[in-house]
């Protein structure tokens, strides 16, 4: 699963997701892509599940690029713990995704295969997304 090798700080504020994605919203590597339509935190497990689904469907053909990286730690407190005594410990990692962000890219396969593979990956995501292709 994806996670940073090291970070400057163990814990982060939750923050907020305002506006559209101004970076990572264009196809850069492949010909087909899956684009987010809603803001969300996408966990490393969800990213990996989507990647595996695309890889399985595409078999040997084509190349896949994962365009998001989970670099935000999410902390949780143990269950049935009283309030206070500081912030919980980091449990998992998430990628902050805003509308317009490209999640996955694909190349070297036909559009029908890419569309079907991206649909399967989209079903693994907690947000609505759309299939887009590079207009030449």
Curated annotation (Swiss-Prot):
Which organism is this entry from?
Lolium perenne (Perennial ryegrass)
Give me the ranges of the annotated region Disordered.
1-20
What gene makes this protein?
rpl16
Write down what this protein is called: Large ribosomal subunit protein uL16c
Pfam families named in the record: Ribosomal_L16
Q: Which GO BP terms, alphabetically?
A: mitochondrial translation
- Assembly: Part of the 50S ribosomal subunit.
Q: Which residues form a coiled coil?
A: none
Q: Which HAMAP family match?
A: Ribosomal_uL16 (MF_01342)
Instruction: Report a single Gene Ontology molecular function.
Output: rRNA binding
